[in-house]
Amino acid sequence: LESYVALFDAAAALTGEPGIALQYGEAVRMQEVSIVGLICEACERTADVGVELNRYAALVVDEDRGEPATLMRGAWQDGNVWIEMPDNALTRDFRMVEAEFARLVWNGRVMFANEPAFRAIRYPGEIHFRHPDPGYRTEYERVFQAPVVFESHWNAMQVDPEFLTLKQPPVNRYVFGILSERADALLKALQATTTTHGRVESALIPVLPRVDVGTDDAAA
């Protein structure tokens, strides 16, 4: 993630556009950069997207822990439905936060551009950021087309409850299964290199045919 942020810094300096992270999130769909995005695109309902996103969070956020992170979660506050980005590696730099919220918003707008039920609601209704105004509020307003609140107590966006009932454009369920199977394999491989148990197993696998030793023996 440090390299990701450094790229935003370099791009902003070279282009003279401080809001380039917002523009990146607006223009580049998650399915263009990650298998997790393809899985989310293949979900049947919008309500399923958060489940799959958090399931494969370790493939999106490199926290070097091999543990699942919560990238997005639903919340109910003051009678409204919100999608919150809780504290995780993505929230350590405000450019990551603005890029991912811009991506989330525009993924929805592009996906449901021809859906009457989506066009009938406001998406998002409002959006909150914990960081202060970085100096380009008008770009935030252009990208999100909704009221923007800085220095809030959370990073979150308000959505119409109807949004969570929308069915996504149909995708072959076989494709969804293949993508999930591949992502599970990638997740397992990642965990094998980031957890203590996985590192021990990886070290022992080359000698297992020659030496009768198991992970329990190694731990002892």
PLM feature segments, named:
Residues 4, 35, 42, 93, ...:
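Residue-level recognition of alpha-helical structural elements
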Residues 3, 45, 49, 92, ...:
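Short amphipathic alpha-helical segments
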Residues 59-67, 113-118, 190:
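Active-site phosphate-binding and catalytic loops of NTP-dependent enzymes
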Residues 69-164:
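DNA-contacting interfaces and partner/effector-binding or oligomerization modules
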Residues 53, 97-104, 176-183:
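Short amphipathic C-terminal alpha-helix that caps PH/PH-like domains
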Residues 34-40, 86-90, 165, 186-187:
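Short hinge/gating elements
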Residues 134-220:
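Extended mid-to-C-terminal alpha-helical interaction segments
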Residues 1-80, 84:
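N-terminal low-complexity or simple alpha-helical regulatory segments
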